[in-house]
Each structure stands twice: as structure tokens, then as C-alpha cells.
Amino acid sequence: MALRDIKPTRSELINLKRKIQLSQRGYKILKMKRDGLIMEFFKILSEAKDSRGELLRRYKHAVEMMAVANTVEGALGVKAAAFSVKETPEITLKSKNIMGVVVPEIESSKVKKTLADRGYGVLGTSPVIDETASSFEDLVEAIIESAEIETTMKRLLDEIEKTKRRVNALEFKVIPELTEARDFIKMRLDEMEREELFRMKKIKARGSS
């Protein structure tokens, strides 16, 4: 806001005071929102660490079980068991609100299956196939949970950065500029008042001489 463009009037002074009040109120609200979002982010971050660890553990276990199944049943036996599964997991994507931020809520069904659901039956396959299938079902569940948490983290982080930029803009640019403009108008009005008073005194002095 260039000071030369400001009209030093009382109405403009009132207008600037109102803008400063609104900006300060907005600054406080945004600061509270930013702090709240940061707290939520660190809660999710703690969950994310656990989720990543569990995902890695289940992934390693599933890979190990696949290696064992390939050794015991052979690649063709494993593929035959995999292709016998008729129902695939169902994913429902919903949303929830965390301090004004819309984040995903993922619901899944038909991930964990019984022997009957898997379709390959007990006869002709070893228990290793069943253990391998179960380990990959566990892995899918971990992936779904991790996807929800990681996406939530990213959206919260994006909103934190956006809110921080707005807080900084108000604190270091908008409010200081408005305050400077207000002080400038007050100074100019005081000067004009003194000039008017001096002029009136001169007129009065002339009239009495």
C-alpha cells in the first residue's frame, strides 16, 4: 500500500481501523487453526510410523511365504491357487473432516477370506498355500490402512503450509502496511488540524488589529 495513494480523511482512518481489527481477528483464528493442524499432523505422523513398520513387516512375511509356496507347490501350483479365487476385495472411499480439511476414509471388505472363499479347496494343496494367501491378505489390509494415513498426512501438511503462508502474510505484510497507513493518516490529520488552528489564529489576530 503506497502512502502517496492514501487519502488522509477521517472516513479513511475509520475504514483502516476496521480493516486492522478484521485482519488481527483473522490472524488469531488462522494461527489457532495452524497450531491445531500441526497437532493433528503429529498424531497422524505417529500412526504413520507404526503403519509403515507394520506394512514392511507384512510385506517381508508375504514375500517369504511366496518363496516357500513356490518351493513346495511350484510356480504353476501357486498360480492355479491364485486364479481359483473368484471374489476380489472391495474398496469404498469415503471422507471425513479434520479441522476443515477433507481427508479420505477407506473401508474394505472381502480382503480376508475363508478356505471356501479362496476357491482352491483343501485337497490337492498344502497348508503353505493357505498361509501364503493369508499373508498376502494381511498385506493388502496394511496397504489400505497405510494409504489412508499417508494421504491424510499429505493433505494436512498441504493445509498447514497454506495456512502458514496466510498467517505470515497477515503478520508481516497486511497488518504492518495497514498500521503504517493508519499512522500516516493520523499524522496528516494532526498536521492539518494544527495548520487550520494556526490559520484561524492568524485570521483572528488580523481581525483584532
From Swiss-Prot:
One term under GO cellular component: plasma membrane
Q: Which UniProt keywords apply?
A: ATP synthesis, Cell membrane, Hydrogen ion transport, Ion transport, Membrane, Transport
Q: Short name of one Pfam family for this protein?
A: ATP-synt_D
The entry's localization annotation reads: Cell membrane
Q: Which InterPro entries match?
A: V_ATPase_D
How does the record classify its membrane topology?
Peripheral membrane protein
Q: What does this protein's UniProt record list under function? A: Component of the A-type ATP synthase that produces ATP from ADP in the presence of a proton gradient across the membrane.
Subunit field text: Has multiple subunits with at least A(3), B(3), C, D, E, F, H, I and proteolipid K(x).
For this entry, the protein name equals A-type ATP synthase subunit D
Its lineage opens with:
Archaea, Methanobacteriati, Methanobacteriota, Stenosarchaea group, Methanomicrobia
Instruction: Tell me the name of the encoding gene.
Output: atpD
